[in-house]
């Protein structure tokens, strides 16, 4: 299972929080789509921002705000070195050139960067841009980071993605994630994974064989 330091070295989204940040829990699984079997790990990140606020007596006090962020890290070899973000994690993120596409709606909705102009141009097909605009309507503050290692980090603010039919909340995290590992039905998660599979189908034209999860990929 990934550690936060490992995640933050590969993806900017795990660098949130100017005070503290930690992975509350993770859960591993696979999704079998019509063409590809996708290995994924779900992560629940909790991070804290702090700032100083001046009180009525002129003194300053430090105020802490806690936030939750959710993500799926998926084996995704078809796209590398591209970042599409509707919500930038922090001002400390590496400065990268922003690429403009032919879609004004997309340019207004996303910060689109990459390792090279060629990688961005190959990724930004009209069909993909339309798909991402629809994804933004489905998930709050959605970000997609395609690493050079062949992984996709799909991150968002929607806690409901991991909601399940039985009563329960994040109040008892160990039990919650233990149930997930045991195969608890997650009706809101698999539609999101189906969207990831749809994106894979848009970009797997250079691959002759469907992707299957191997022991090496699971490590």
Question: What are the residue ranges of the model-derived segments?
Answer:
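Charged, low-complexity intrinsically disordered regions
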Residues: 4-219
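Active-site loops and adjacent core secondary-structure elements that bind or stabilize anionic groups
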Residues: 1
